[in-house]
Amino acid sequence: RPLPEGLIRGSDASMRAIEAARVNTGRLLGGKGIVLTKRRYQDLHPLRDVTIVCNPPYGIRMKREQDMVRFMKDFGDFLKQRCQGSKAYVYFGDRALIKSVGLRTSWKRPLKNGPLDGRLVKYEMY
């Protein structure tokens, strides 16, 4: 059955990532109804009572460890302050960064992404 327009939304700070996502979602039945925009997570309106799935930058995509730790802390603050009532599933290519988010995990699962032996982590915001 057709996917209602805008039911699933995605964003990224990188236009290249958005273009790749458009190609991939275009292959899905109903994928044309997925709304993708170039936008940093910091610029999103509050996300209340939704499910968030994300693959934030990590080692390969960011250069310095300090930058990654700071990014993850800021991302954790965003989840806590602007995503009340939501569930967030976050992929970590570098397991050491999980603690940098500063939130308690509901669960962690091993998940390979190509050669990366990462973790999918669930957070529940209250």
Predicted segments, located by residue:
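Class I S-adenosyl-L-methionine-dependent methyltransferase catalytic core
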Residues: 1-126
